[in-house]
Amino acid sequence: MPKSLLFALASLPLMAVELKVDHATVAGKDVRAMQRALQAAGLACEYGGPHSNHATEMALTSFPDGSYLEQIAIQPNADPAAVAAHEWHKQLQSDGGPCAWAVRPADLGAEVTRLRAASIQVSEPKKNGRKRPDGVQIEWEAAQVGSGNGNFFPFLIHDFTPRERRAYPSGKPTTTDFTGVSKVVIAVKDLDASIAQFRRAYGFPAPERQDDPEFGAKLAWFRGTPVVLATPLSPQSWLEARIREFGETPCAFILGAARVMDVHKPAAWFGRHVVWADSAKLGWHLGFETK
């Protein structure tokens, strides 16, 4: 067996790491316009307030499993320099839609150490926060994994204030029509190379694969995780154009549906039905998954 393969196998975690979505983020110019579009697609939203970075504000849709869908946008009277310096400035300034995702490990420090031991780059945790419209202050820290901030690997988040204040501004899930963020679909240039990166970072077994011509992608899903990798089937596809514009980032999010959805022709992804919202109206790709 080649030494390089032995080294790669030795660097894998002994057991696969459990990844549970803390939140998934959609970016745009105007948070209220984003809220209206989501509400038209059947999702209620709550305004969450401005961030302390002088660049962005957010709204969210939270779910019974604790995850939430963040709508992040440029705040009124934002500092142009702060917006330009923001990790997601391209998506913010061009209504780019899905841009990042986060997980909340039980022990952030231990997870940073584990990832670095697997030769995965992790930044030092950085403190952030925002004030809710009701005046409640929320504080957390986040660490960037890999070269992007939640673009490929999820960033890590740890709360200093009770997590419920961040996820449930009204004290309960925004909606019970959907169970949570079940899949994060990440657009990638090289499917095999991306699979290898996730397996090295998290110890996942080999993924299941399928093609979806209508979505325009070759797909790979790590069973039991939210991670779906998608590479374009055609150089002329919307997915190829998206990768050229934004790089390897989330291109779609899929929510678990709490009820059977009555549709004529759902997509079939890995044994489950996926119903897609109208991306032309919403401005990005959002799916609803049923058994």
Predicted regions, residues:
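Generic detector of N-terminal low-structure segments
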Residues: A8-L9, T290
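Sec-dependent signal peptide recognition
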Residues: M1-A8
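Hydrophobic h-region of N-terminal signal peptides that target proteins for export
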Residues: L9-A16
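Charged, often glycine-rich, active-site loop that binds/positions anionic groups
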Residues: M58-S62
